[in-house]
């Protein structure tokens, strides 16, 4: 199956090798800002998703996703997954276990904004299982 590559105003960036161990599939990262507030443009190849993870902070913190292209998923632990499209915004409070990534047959691009806080750190957890992930993509196809 041929997958259309989505183009946005930001460059795709290089292969996300620094975080590859926390992703299933291929992702790309273009750090747009490392000053004041870190902002990265993350591109997920079809079927790519990151592991469950938590953005910890003793005060403030969390993450904001600004979806810019393609089709993706966001899910918080214990909640149903949410389909994401260009223009969607996701506010992720500190301490919430979650994952995000592309649909099986679409590229997905978002800006990841790290919300400033005190005592911030990321905890990477288990991968989203293929079984869990494939159920979402079957629902989307219906």
What kind of region is each of these model predictions?
Residues 49-52, 59-86, 96:
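A short beta-strand-loop-beta hairpin characteristic of the jelly-roll/cupin
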Residues 41, 54, 68, 76-78, ...:
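Residue-level recognition of conserved beta-strand positions in structured domain cores
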Residues 35-37, 45-50, 69-73, 118:
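Short, charged/polar surface micro-motifs in flexible loops or helix N-caps
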Residues 42, 90:
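Conserved GNAT-family N-acetyltransferase fold
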Residues 1-38, 51, 121-142:
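A short, N-terminal "cap"/entry segment at the start of jelly-roll beta-barrel domains
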Residues 73, 80-81, 85-86, 94-123:
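Ligand-binding loop in jelly-roll beta-barrel domains
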Residues 36, 59-61, 106-107:
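Short acidic/glycine-enriched loop/turn segments that link adjacent beta-strands
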């Amino acid at each position: 199956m041929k997958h259309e590559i989505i183009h946005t105003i930001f460059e795709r960036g290089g292969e996300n090798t620094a975080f590859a161990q926390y992703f299933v599939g291929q992702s790309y990262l273009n750090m747009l800002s490392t000053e004041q507030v870190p902002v990265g443009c993350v591109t997920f190849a079809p079927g790519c998703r990151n592991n469950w993870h938590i953005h910890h902070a003793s005060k403030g913190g969390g993450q904001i996703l600004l979806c810019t292209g393609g089709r993706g998923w966001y899910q918080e632990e214990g909640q149903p997954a949410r389909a994401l499209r260009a223009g969607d915004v996701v506010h992720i409070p500190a301490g919430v276990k979650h994952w995000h990534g592309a649909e099986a047959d679409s590229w997905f691009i978002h800006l990841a904004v790290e919300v400033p806080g005190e005592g911030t750190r990321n905890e990477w957890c288990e991968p989203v299982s293929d079984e869990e992930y494939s159920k979402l993509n079957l629902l989307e196809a219906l």
